[in-house]
Amino acid sequence: MLVTYNHEYPKQLRTGFIGCGGHAYRNVYPTFQYAPVNLVAVCDLDPVRAATCAKVFGAERHYSDHLEMLAREELDLVFIVTNVDEHGRPRYPKLAIDCLRAGLHVWIEKPPASSSGEIREMIRVSSETGRHVAVGFKKMFFPANVKAKEIVSRPEFGPITSITARYPQSLPPFEDRGDSRKMVSFLDHIVHPHSVLRLLGGPIEWIFVNRNSAVGSAIVSIRFTSGAAGNLHLSTGQSSTSFLERLEIIGDGENLVVENNIRLIHYRRSKSKIEYGRSGDYFGALTDDSAPLYWEPEFSLGQLYNKGLFLLGYAPEVIQFTTRLLDGKAPVHGTLKDALELLQIYEAYRRPDGIIHPIKESS
């Protein structure tokens, strides 16, 4: 992707921002350098923090009441990055609906809600108001995952037959899963691997959880509606020095691997066959047009592609949403439809282990 700098866009979206915490400060506000965003106002319950954010990121005004900001400012779009309430539930549904009813498009960070019912309500209000909502499922925008999506969509890759993924997350014991406060970490993180699985494998038909009671790790068997088989390894218990994630997708005669979110290896279809027991060198089965392809960024040059804002999907997800809004289009990825399935999957995880749990259609 070729990147346009903020000042190069001929038109920009008048933007407000609710939330001035550490995550927003590090990872979301800085993306506006590369998006068609005119940051007009920011809001935080802590007025000092709001004033600081306004000063650092160039907002004209700051507020400690989001309703006051919505009433006073002429905005096109609001970004919302907040924490959970006292019950452990994300604050996004109410805040997003307030913004939608004010006639504004909305970008919210993940996790977008604590229930699929809250997602359905946001879908209803979004449809009612004609305003779009995007959700920060950043892993749908990792360059390695986007490239993987491109490769598996090619006819020569064949239909996806199986997917395996690894993510270091603990699933709380069943007796704790009814308490949203004890599920905060799981809800916050489980959307990461499942958003990638949705991007690459499509909707899920059911999951089956086999959990280890000692540390809360699990092997999750998955059936995609396409018929592909899936396996998600929740690998808590691993060393803190270990790599965190791995993904493999197998088609029909080809496969690819994404390691540590940046290293992609595409094992292409072999165009020759070697009789077993007759090959004297390991290059015999490979031709230049069928050897594996390998990608990994360099970390020497001062490029955008090796910045965390781009490698971790933050800038690409913001650029996608804002540029499509300028074109009068809805987001393609990180949609409320994506969010609906991910919350239905989260609800399935809250049920007892060792049982197949169907995932409802995300219609």
Where do the language-model regions lie?
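Beta-strand-loop-alpha-helix segment that lines the small-molecule cofactor/substrate pocket
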Residues: 77, 88-140
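Conserved SAM-binding strand-loop segment of SAM-dependent methyltransferases
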Residues: 59-66
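Intrinsically disordered, low-complexity Ser/Thr- and acidic-rich flexible linkers and loops
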Residues: 4-7, 80-94, 283-286
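Short, Asp-centered acidic motifs that coordinate Mg2+ and/or phosphate
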Residues: 41, 61, 77, 162, ...
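Predominantly a Rossmann-like dinucleotide-binding segment in NAD(P)-dependent oxidoreductases
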Residues: 139-210, 356
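Contiguous beta-strand/loop segments that form the cofactor/metal-binding neighborhood of enzyme cores
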Residues: 1, 188-270, 315-329, 346-349, ...
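C-terminal helix-rich "cap/oligomerization" subdomain common to oxidoreductases
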Residues: 1-11, 17, 77-82, 131, ...
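N-terminal Rossmann-like dinucleotide-binding module
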Residues: 1-57
